[in-house]
């Protein structure tokens, strides 16, 4: 059984990923390039050139789980500007899954409390 309630870290690999890759081909860059270990608290997302499909890689404690989502219409708003592993907040992850950009320019940004006097 997949328990995503344990996921605390949502990572996306920015740029393009060859979507022909399966589990071993996706685990390799996570561990070798980015020095990240697979665990039950992390979900890794990959997107190809067409931006209409993503793969999610997850470790459930006994083995790797590979999830695949293909949109029937529209495209994911995927950051293409650099090859890196980006950590998302839960809100950014929801935005991405809802078809929005993770870099919302109109969303309220966290601020610091001001003085009252």
Model-derived regions, located:
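Polybasic/polar functional segments that serve as interface/processing modules
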Residues: 1-117
